[in-house]
A protein has these predicted regions:
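Proline-anchored loop/turn motifs at beta-strand termini and strand-loop-strand connectors
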Residues: 5-24
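Conserved polar/disulfide-associated segments of primarily extracytoplasmic proteins
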Residues: 18-127, 134
Length: 139
């Protein structure tokens, strides 16, 4: 299935449903156990590592998620460069694992793609995540 928005298209497995969360387009598997969210990001912020550090700081000084644990904030070797923020948190009796990738897509556009799965399913879902990321196209 291919999800399209004004600024991008991305492929996800058949049967996933589309939802929105603010400005983000969310695509959720039928069981509600895996999700990918895509949102436009500020292209004028070239230091994506600093961007994630600020986001984490804001999260920790606000009403952050229960059980927040940073896994890493690191450079991402994706497209025109970017950074990943990976973390875990607890919600609804589940330990969740998230990777948020901020990157420049060209044509003055930048995006954040977030991938969320239960922590105990993280490793076996990485192939799907790589396939989804490879399918991303900026418009």
């Amino acid at each position: 299935m291919r999800a399209q928005d004004a600024g991008f298209s991305i492929g996800v497995p058949n049967g996933w449903r589309r939802a929105t969360d603010g400005a983000a387009v969310c695509l959720i598997d039928p069981a509600g156990r895996r999700a990918v969210a895509v949102a436009a990001a500020a292209p004028e912020d070239p230091d994506r590592m600093a961007y994630w550090q600020r986001e984490e700081n804001d999260l920790l000084h606000g009403a952050g998620p229960t059980g927040y644990q940073r896994v890493d904030i690191s450079p991402a070797l994706y497209r025109k460069g970017g950074a990943d923020w990976e973390y875990r948190y607890d919600a609804d009796g589940v330990r969740w694992h998230v990777l948020r990738r901020a990157f420049a897509a060209g044509n003055g556009k930048a995006f954040v793609i977030s991938w969320t799965t239960p922590d105990d399913e993280w490793d076996r879902n990485q192939r799907d995540f790589r396939t989804i990321m490879q399918s991303f196209e900026s418009r």
